[in-house]
């Protein structure tokens, strides 16, 4: 194997260099955040003593006992660096986000910039201009495409939508493709639904926006284009949130249970929004919020995935899939002809040399054309991957 891969799993960054073993890359900045938080908790520990009494410290001071497992630090995106041996990655904490440069040959990390409440994901560097495209997320549930030049970040899309997964077009310094879905809001302004994802092409110089793929029955995700103009993307059936079909005999039960189901639906949607913005579930009644390796639920391209259920249902396979076979990797030629590349695809990437790699969520494969795919990596809950040059 002569390929360098970086992939994300539950907010952690992993790197595989050729045939060497996979190694996790830990951010020193992120670890410093954790250490400072723990030290602050320890300094204030006396305020939380005596919690077994009616007027314990926590009640008097309005603070809660800290749990270092609940400290939210995650790597949110990765792309190529400016020189060989380097990669860029985005990092998110509770109140700060930033862009970092990592040299794997020297094991050195350098902070390029950080800002309060910055949430950037889906990084993609333009090899000629060094512009970095990304998805920037906001507390109201929207996300826009932005470009980073040096330490400056500029939004290039806008609207009440979820704009994600930008990718530069080969040979074009000023064009990129991305996926976008509109948000539906009620009269009070709360987001209540997400439309189908479409694929758009944007010219940064002229501001021209062209729709490449759109269908109310499907989501089109993670667009990538090769030098020949072939468009690669993930296609999956669109699901309207909360849409279900019940038999007439269950109508009475539906009426009786309507208030409960309405409350449950509202909670699950708020949980969805929490996962979208902070990647943290709201279900903390059973204990503290734990960013642990055994997390059972994750948000993958606008869809909440029950990882435990998905892996159980595909356990009969040698390598179980995190997503169903309806998540298809498609190659679409400029003529409009489409070919199925693989099924059960959660993420993929391709480079200018024609390498195409994809993941089913638990492993990474290299596509070999007509032959069987080559297994490269076995992992767990793989959310995103990038070929590093």
Language-model features: locations:
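Sequence signature of WD/YWTD-type beta-propeller architectures
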Residues: 1-389
């Amino acid at each position: 194997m002569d390929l360098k891969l970086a992939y994300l799993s539950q907010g952690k960054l992993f790197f595989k260099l050729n045939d060497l073993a996979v190694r996790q890359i830990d951010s020193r900045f992120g670890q410093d955040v954790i250490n400072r938080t723990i030290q602050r908790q320890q300094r204030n520990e006396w305020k939380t003593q005596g919690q077994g009494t009616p007027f314990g410290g926590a009640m008097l001071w309005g603070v809660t006992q800290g749990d270092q497992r609940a400290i939210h630090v995650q790597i949110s995106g990765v792309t190529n660096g400016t020189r060989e041996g380097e990669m860029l990655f985005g990092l998110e904490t509770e109140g700060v986000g930033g862009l970092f440069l990592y040299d794997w040959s020297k094991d050195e990390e350098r902070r390029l910039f950080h800002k309060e409440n910055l949430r950037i994901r889906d990084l993609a560097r333009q090899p000629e201009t060094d512009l970095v495209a990304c998805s920037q997320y906001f507390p109201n549930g929207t996300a826009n495409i932005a470009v980073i030049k040096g330490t400056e970040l500029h939004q290039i899309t806008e609207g009440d939508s979820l704009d994600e997964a930008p990718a530069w077009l080969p040979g074009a310094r000023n064009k990129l493709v991305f996926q976008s879905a509109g948000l539906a809001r009620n009269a009070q302004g709360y987001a209540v639904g997400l439309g189908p994802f479409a694929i758009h092409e944007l010219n940064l110089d002229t501001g021209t926006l062209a729709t490449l793929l759109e269908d109310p029955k499907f989501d089109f995700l993670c667009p990538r284009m090769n030098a020949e103009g072939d468009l690669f993307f993930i296609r999956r059936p669109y699901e309207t949130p909360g849409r279900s079909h019940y038999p007439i005999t269950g109508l009475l039960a539906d009426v009786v249970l309507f208030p409960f189901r309405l409350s449950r639906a509202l909670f699950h949607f708020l949980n969805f929004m929490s996962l979208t913005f902070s990647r943290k579930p709201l279900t903390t009644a059973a204990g503290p919020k734990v960013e642990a390796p055994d997390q059972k639920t994750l948000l993958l391209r606008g869809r909440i995935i029950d990882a435990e259920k998905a892996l159980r249902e595909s356990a009969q396979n040698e390598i179980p899939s995190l997503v169903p076979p309806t998540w298809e990797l498609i190659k679409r030629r400029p003529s409009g002809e489409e070919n199925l590349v693989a099924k059960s695809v959660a993420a993929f990437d391709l480079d200018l040399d024609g390498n195409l790699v994809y993941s089913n969520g638990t492993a990474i494969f290299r596509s070999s054309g007509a032959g069987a795919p080559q297994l490269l990596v076995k992992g767990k809950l793989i959310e995103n991957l990038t070929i590093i040059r």
